[in-house]
């Protein structure tokens, strides 16, 4: 690597790299997935240049690995993301999210009358594929919402 081609975000020795996140989505992922609730170092790259996307976000979390469920839950926000498992500075595993059947403990129901706002329950949504959209159905109020409505909440 020449001095003209240096990394824009420092490499990590061990942990997870979430790459190819659509620009402006990185912070939302950190918040929704509670990725900052750790004492491990997190490196965030925002609006980085990308050949295929134009611009992208990137998240690196040291000494932390995402479960398969967590990776799949990224599909609503970053369907083209790549989740890399890093060990000793090398990529030892690579996966892409696929739409799960359910998303638990991440989203908030947009229905202000939903019991999930008043009771200490974990959110839970069924993921329903529609012709031109992805709908999310709340386990508690049983209302269906376009995924964009829930994501904006």
UniProtKB/Swiss-Prot annotation:
Biological process GO annotation list? 'de novo' pyrimidine nucleobase biosynthetic process; pyrimidine nucleotide biosynthetic process
What single Pfam family name could you report for this chain, choosing any that match?
PyrI_C
Residue positions annotated to bind Zn(2+) are 109, 114, 138, 141
Q: Which SUPFAM superfamilies match?
A: Aspartate carbamoyltransferase, Regulatory-chain, C-terminal domain, Aspartate carbamoyltransferase, Regulatory-chain, N-terminal domain
Write out the function statement from the record.
Involved in allosteric regulation of aspartate carbamoyltransferase.
What HAMAP family would the database entry show?
Asp_carb_tr_reg
Output the Gene Ontology terms for molecular function.
metal ion binding
**NCBIfam families xref list:** ATCase_reg
- Protein name in the entry: Aspartate carbamoyltransferase regulatory chain
Q: Which organism is it from?
A: Shigella dysenteriae serotype 1 (strain Sd197)
UniProt cofactor(s): Zn(2+)
Q: Keywords in UniProt for this one?
A: Metal-binding, Pyrimidine biosynthesis, Zinc
- Return the GO cellular component terms, semicolon-separated: aspartate carbamoyltransferase complex
| Cofactor binding remark | Binds 1 zinc ion per subunit.
Q: Whom does it interact with, and what assembly results?
A: Contains catalytic and regulatory chains.
